[in-house]
């Protein structure tokens, strides 16, 4: 696994985008909850930027999902184990949940009503907004409290989710560490067995050389004995032929 892996490049961009989105979400919440009247342009700009940022993050997460599907289809080609894939899937799932929570907060009916109120205040101006706000203080005071409560719940959920991700990553790192230890022990055992086999092969080579030397000596002795046997046969044959020749000559002279 290389640091040039495109997953980590896109992951870094997604993390930056999430940080930006969380900052925009905090500012957007302050604009809606703040006692001071914000301009309509600022509210609209913050809302649009936040929505565009969340949409961009969702697209990047879809791209990361596709890369994981490709890796799962051919894991040997990319040399990624199941633990690394689980870590990547956990990052995508947690980030998608963060985006979903912010979108749910933005689309809540109470938040929409409060946003509409702020927009009306911005259009009517400070003086008219004060007169208009005096008649509906109770109604929007309740909406303010609901938004504050929802925002606090959102922050608590995000903190709990981040803690869960950290714990999952710690567990996965422990699994990876254990796997590395097992592989190290296996490599040491294999190395020891290879050394033993090398010693055995060396001993066998020496024995083979000794056997070959003894075999050469035996072959030389056999050749020498064979040569001596051949010479004796030749002398015997000559003696027999000489005797036969003498007999023939004797018979010839007698006759």
Curated annotation (Swiss-Prot):
Domain of life: Eukaryota
Record-linked InterPro entries: SNARE (IPR010989), Syntaxin-6/10/61_N (IPR015260), Syntaxin/epimorphin_CS (IPR006012), T_SNARE_dom (IPR000727)
Tissues where this protein is expressed: Widely expressed, with relatively higher expression in brain, lung and kidney.
Designated name of the protein: Syntaxin-6
GO terms assigned for molecular function: SNAP receptor activity; SNARE binding; syntaxin binding
Species the sequence originates in: Rattus norvegicus
Gene symbol of the encoding locus: Stx6
Region (Interaction with BLTP3B), start-end ranges: 2-112
Cytoplasmic-side segments: 2-234
Residues recorded as bearing N-acetylserine in the entry: 2
Coiled coil: 41-74
Similarity section: Belongs to the syntaxin family.
GO CC, alphabetical: cytosol; early endosome; endomembrane system; Golgi apparatus; Golgi membrane; membrane; nucleoplasm; perinuclear region of cytoplasm
Record-annotated t-SNARE coiled-coil homology domain positions: 163-225
Subcellular location: Golgi apparatus membrane; Golgi apparatus, trans-Golgi network membrane; Recycling endosome membrane
């Amino acid at each position: 696994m290389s640091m040039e892996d495109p997953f980590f490049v896109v992951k870094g961009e997604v993390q930056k985008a999430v940080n930006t989105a969380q900052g925009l979400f905090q500012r957007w919440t302050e604009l809606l909850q703040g006692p001071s009247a914000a301009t309509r342009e600022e509210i609209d700009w913050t809302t649009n930027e936040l929505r565009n940022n969340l949409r961009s993050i969702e697209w990047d997460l879809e791209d990361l999902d596709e890369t994981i599907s490709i890796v799962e289809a051919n894991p040997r080609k990319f040399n990624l184990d199941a633990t690394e894939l689980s870590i990547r899937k956990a990052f995508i799932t947690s980030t998608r949940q963060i985006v979903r929570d912010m979108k749910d907060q933005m689309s809540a009916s109470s938040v929409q009503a409060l946003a509409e109120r702020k927009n009306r205040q911005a259009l009517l101006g400070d003086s008219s907004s004060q007169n208009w706000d005096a008649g509906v203080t109770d109604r929007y005071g309740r909406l303010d409290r609901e938004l504050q409560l929802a925002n606090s719940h959102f922050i608590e959920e995000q903190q709990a989710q981040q803690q869960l991700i950290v714990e999952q990553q710690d567990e996965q790192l422990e699994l990876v560490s254990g796997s590395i230890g097992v592989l190290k022990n296996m490599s040491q055992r294999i190395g020891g067995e290879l050394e033993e086999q090398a010693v055995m092969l060396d001993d066998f080579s020496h024995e083979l050389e000794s056997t070959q030397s003894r075999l050469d000596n035996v072959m030389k002795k056999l050749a020498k004995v064979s040569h001596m046997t051949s010479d004796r046969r030749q002398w015997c044959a000559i003696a027999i032929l000489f005797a036969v020749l003498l007999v023939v000559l004797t018979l010839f002279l007698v006759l």
